[in-house]
Amino acid sequence: MSSAGKVASLPEVAKRVAAARGGGKQIALANGVFDLLHVGHIRYLEGAKALADVLVVAINADASARANKGPGRPVVPAPERAELVAALACTDHVLIFDEPNVRGVISALQPDVHVKGTDYTPETIPEREAVLAYG
């Protein structure tokens, strides 16, 4: 699939995930701003992909990126950040979300694995309760 074909809306990604799950595939979800893509992002996403058959990456929309990163951010607009992340071999599906966290995305996709960066502990993951809600 081309990188442009990997970027889709949450409802479309949910359909793709359901089809993959129906085929016995494990689903991982990673999320972040991914502004000024760097090697740490690549390592995070490659590590996430190693945990499942299908990797979905949820990217913060510009407004939520600005709320998280501060004024002047993001440098790169969300559609371009999505396209950059989609161009990586390790990603299967990419979506843009406009909430402060990915609880809604987690509830919609119910991934087998929700992957966060090393700056979080299990206790400090904002979406912890959303993951625990479906097991």
Locate the predicted segments by residue.
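Nucleotidyltransferase catalytic core that binds NTPs
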Residues: M1-G135
